[in-house]
Amino acid sequence: ASTPAADKDLIARCVCIKLNGGLGTSMGLQKAKSLLKIKGEDTFLDLIVRQVKHLRSISGTPVRLLLMNSFSTSADTLAYLEKYAADGFADPAQVELMQNRVPKILADGLSPASCPEQPELEWCPPGHGDLYPALLGSGWLDRLLADGVKYAFVSNSDNLGAQLDMNFLRW
């Protein structure tokens, strides 16, 4: 079935934002959780790319995928996306929204954590609530608005059941 022109216009004004800052450590992976294999050799990230490519296909527009990475997930995610370079998913300037980082605070006394032998352990990502400050502070919000984006579909990178629902866009 073909996609109605009004729906194509709505899809064209949407960005798909995936929260991709978490590591899969509880599942034995020291990389982004989105790089876990979930079916055969396919990862969450492979299926996310397929979902966005499908939206591009049915709308005939370059629907944007934006991954909110953390300092812990950026490098492996971008390296993995190299296999999708021909589809426009490998350029960090086009697909990456970097989450901020905040100092780890010790529960006892609320002072900053100190780890001189591994200073990177003194920092942590602030979590999903950082989406709005990261969009604003990175300049992505202005870029998206300038590109005519009006709607943002946001979900965790490991939630493949969450997909863009045209009923919400039509409302």
PLM features: residue spans?
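Domain-scale recognition of functional cores that engage charged ligands
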Residues: 2-15, 26-171
